[in-house]
UniProtKB/Swiss-Prot annotation:
It comes from the Bacteria. The gene is rpsJ. It holds the Pfam family Ribosomal_S10. One of its GO terms (molecular function) is structural constituent of ribosome. One of its GO terms (biological process) is translation. This is Small ribosomal subunit protein uS10. GO terms for cellular component: ribonucleoprotein complex; ribosome. Signal peptide: none annotated. It comes from Bacteroides fragilis (strain ATCC 25285 / DSM 2151 / CCUG 4856 / JCM 11019 / LMG 10263 / NCTC 9343 / Onslow / VPI 2553 / EN-2). Part of the 30S ribosomal subunit.
Length: 101
């Protein structure tokens, strides 16, 4: 097989992303493939500003922030055993996984 696999992880909780990346790296290294990463990608922050009051007091506002954390993992010289191990791997439900071969 021996192809490059790129895995992108995305979540709103940085602990989930880090634990999932560590789990993937451990699994891939156990199969004998070469791993590059996890590489932290820039954090995307969305800030929402809303009025505290519904009618008056425009100067009184509140801000909310939604941060998304991303990690990138590259796998080189993968085998069929590596792909099978990745398919059987269970990750938390709050993590979005994108795999490119």
């Amino acid at each position: 097989m021996s192809q490059k696999i790129r895995i992108k992880l995305k979540s709103y909780d940085h602990n989930l992303v880090d634990k999932s990346a560590e789990k993937i790296v451990r699994t891939v290294k156990a199969t004998g493939a070469i791993v590059s990463g996890p590489i932290p990608l820039p954090t995307h922050k969305r800030i929402f500003t809303v009025n505290r009051s519904t009618f008056v007091n425009k100067k009184s506002r509140e801000q909310f922030e939604l941060s998304s954390f991303k990690r990138l993992i590259d796998i080189y010289s993968s085998t069929a055993k590596t792909v099978d191990a990745l398919m059987k791997l269970e990750l938390p439900s709050g993590v979005e996984v994108e795999i490119k071969v």
